[in-house]
Amino acid sequence: MSAGSPKFTVSRIAALSLVSLWLAGCTSSSNPPAPVTSVDSGSSSNTNSGMLITPPPKMGATTQQTPQQAPQIQPVQRPVTQPMQTQPVTEQPVQMENGRIVYNRQYGNIPKGSYTGGSTYTVKKGDTLFYIAWITGNDFRDLAQRNSISAPYSLNVGQTLQVGNASGTPITGGNAITQADAAQQGVVTRSAQNSTVAVASQPTITYSEGSGEQSANKMLPNNKPAGTVVTAPVTAPTVSTTEPNASSTSTSAPISAWRWPTDGKVIENFGASEGGNKGIDIAGSKGQAIVATADGRVVYAGNALRGYGNLIIIKHNDDYLSAYAHNDTMLVREQQEVKAGQKIATMGSTGTSSTRLHFEIRYKGKSVNPLRYLPQR
């Protein structure tokens, strides 16, 4: 086939047309940026995608390198839970019973009147009015009245309480029975003198058997028979204080033997120091028998002395008195003669926090250790 023949010319034109069509297809397929979208779709069908895949991983590395969100576990919550676990430790000394706070204090192991800080006390955390009254040797009701504290006796940390008088001694404690002793001692002195004294202008003073309601400082003369009336007439220039024959309990006859006033363990001993216990405390059960420690006469039976509850005082002779406090029921009356071992009361908790007997012996108005007189057991 010659180059100038028509057939050759047609064949050449057809070949050129095919080449041009092929070239047109190549140029049209290279225009769209398909490799960019194939990075996200994961397509690898284009041969050019291998050259364009490398930039997107770099971009993906920069965008995916934000794992700052991983520390968003918020470790701040850990220190919040730890302090909450330590709070019950601070509350261990306190118990709740029936909605009330109960402090774990064993008053039998706490010396009564052991506070030596003077006439004031500063309230600390966990203090109660009864606890402060206990360690300062006071009655909690007197302490509340002295400091104008009303029920339920709420206290504030740092609050200052007056717990003693000007001399630093407790408001109550041993002072009450000491005053009763002084009243009795004055009567005994006048009886022993058997003298005649001048009487100035004064009203007639009468003591009778019904005077048991008066306070311990105005008790019946202990050497008078029950029902005797003593008068001091205003018109008489003098009055004789000569007493009738007194019974054996008003003499200085020695006491042959002392008896334990009740059974039980001594939970608080005698304290000779200032503000210490003026007798001994014996534990027991409510209703337990209380007996007279020796023969004598009841010179006081009542509850006028705060801090002692139902109190009985027995005069044994001119020198000795015995006192029985916190009784539940008193079975004797003032001016009644009693024998050693005679039941005079039942044990209780009046004026105190637990069932017990507070027992004292006084010699010439001074507190003495009852354990020196009671038989060993």
Curated annotation (Swiss-Prot):
LysM domain span: 119-163
A GO-annotated cellular component: cell division site
Lipidation (N-palmitoyl cysteine): 26
GO molecular function: metalloendopeptidase activity
Regions of compositional bias (Low complexity) in chain numbering: 36-50, 62-77
Location of the protein in the cell: Cell inner membrane
Annotated region (4 X 7 AA approximate repeats), positions in chain: 203-250
Membrane topology per record: Lipid-anchor
GO BP annotation list: cell division
Residue ranges, annotated region (Disordered): 30-93
Keyword list, A-Z: Cell cycle, Cell division, Cell inner membrane, Cell membrane, Lipoprotein, Membrane, Palmitate, Repeat, Signal
Source organism superkingdom: Bacteria
Principal subcellular localization: membrane
Compositionally biased residues, Polar residues: 79-93
SMART domains hit by this protein: LysM
Keyword Signal among record annotations: yes
Family per record: Belongs to the E.coli NlpD/Haemophilus LppB family.
Role summary: Activator of the cell wall hydrolase AmiC. Required for septal murein cleavage and daughter cell separation during cell division.
Protein name per UniProt: Murein hydrolase activator NlpD
Organism name: Salmonella typhimurium (strain LT2 / SGSC1412 / ATCC 700720)
Lineage: Bacteria, Pseudomonadati, Pseudomonadota, Gammaproteobacteria, Enterobacterales
Record gene name: nlpD
